[in-house]
Structures are given as structure tokens and as C-alpha cells.
């Protein structure tokens, strides 16, 4: 079952140097089903962004996120909740960002 294998890496995501914010400011959702949506929320329930993962090869895959919200703002330190969903199933988990 794909729901047991979805992960966010790195988790927690920690920015340790100023140059990382420019060049490497992203996390990866791995082991995704080929067609899914990733909804990201703050712990307070505010919608941060929705990512659409589409891999027409049918393989499990990876989707990167640059840590920028749907309002084009950098996200802040905190705990975030994500929901990966397909037409048939979903998984909910969390990840941390430390700046």
C-alpha cells in the first residue's frame, strides 16, 4: 500500500547557512503514487499550497517543493501537515521546518 511509504525528506528541514536559502531551499515528497495531489497546511489549518504530482509512466515518484506558499511567500519555521490523496485513498502526516 503506497500510503505506508510516502515520506518527506529531509524531515526536519533545517536551514543552517544563509546560502542554503538561495540554492537548496526545498524538500521532497518521495514514494508518491503516479497521480496525486499534495495539500499542505499549517498546524492551525491554514492552506499553504497544493502540489499536483503527475507521472504518466505509472511509477512511484518524487515531487519537490521550494517552500514558497501559494501567495508567493517563504514559509516560516513550524510544523506543517500534509495530505497526499488519490482518487481512491489518502495519507496524512507532518513535517517540520527549522530556520
Where are these regions (language model features)?
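Glycine-centered tight-turn motifs at strand-turn-strand junctions
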Residues: 47-75, 86-89
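Short, glycine-anchored, charge-dense loop/turn motifs used at functional sites
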Residues: 36-48, 80-82
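Residue-level detector of conserved, well-ordered beta-strand and adjacent loop positions
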Residues: 9, 30, 52, 66-68, ...
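Glycine-centered coil/turn sites that cap beta-strands in beta-rich domains
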Residues: 1-39, 65
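Terminal processing/anchoring signals of secreted or surface-associated proteins
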Residues: 8-11, 45, 65, 80, ...
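C-terminal tail/sorting-segment detector
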Residues: 79-99
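Residue-level signal for short segments within beta-strands and strand-turn junctions
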Residues: 10, 40-44, 69, 86, ...
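Short, conserved beta-strand segments of beta-strand-rich sandwich/propeller modules, principally
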Residues: 26, 76-81
